[in-house]
Amino acid sequence: MKKRKFANAAVMLILLSVVGYAFFGSPVEMYRRGELRKAMAAVEDGEVTLNEIVPFAWDSVYSFGPYTTQEQMEEIMGISARRLEESPSEGMVQLVFVNGGQIVCGVCGYISKEGYSVSFDEKINFADNVVFRAKRDADGILWLTEPHD
């Protein structure tokens, strides 16, 4: 009887995990998004690189504009991106961090909710150590703009 209860509990736990993953995505990615949001919240006005900010390993980051389809993202990145979503409107941040050919963090959310916006053309490599201008607006939103040398 105890074995059956244990087996039922194990099956239920596995099912809940699968359903949770299907609806909410990877808990590791969720954790990384939260850590990235915290790191962005700590950035002060001035010059900064993503290498200094991003709190997890990455070798390239992609930025996609609104309405970019999953298929277009996959073609640009050259990898399968099953969990990526199209940004449904203007005013959203859409970043995909890749490490070793695997997506390690995807951000698709309203700038006002994420608390930051990062503006660059399509792709940045970690090795490039691109410098951004960091500026907070009156609402406390961090704007990382215009990479420059």
Question: Which stretches of residues belong to each language-model region?
Answer:
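Short, structured surface segments that line ligand/substrate-binding pockets
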Residues: 85, 89-107
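N-terminal export/targeting and maturation segments
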Residues: 3-9, 16-84
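A short acidic/small-residue loop/turn micro-motif
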Residues: 108-113
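Exposed boundary/loop context
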Residues: 10-13, 94
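C-terminal partner/receptor-binding element of secreted or periplasmic proteins
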Residues: 114-149
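Short, low-complexity, polar/charged sequence segments that are solvent-exposed and flexible
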Residues: 80-84, 101, 115-116
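Extracytoplasmic
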Residues: 56-58, 89-92, 127
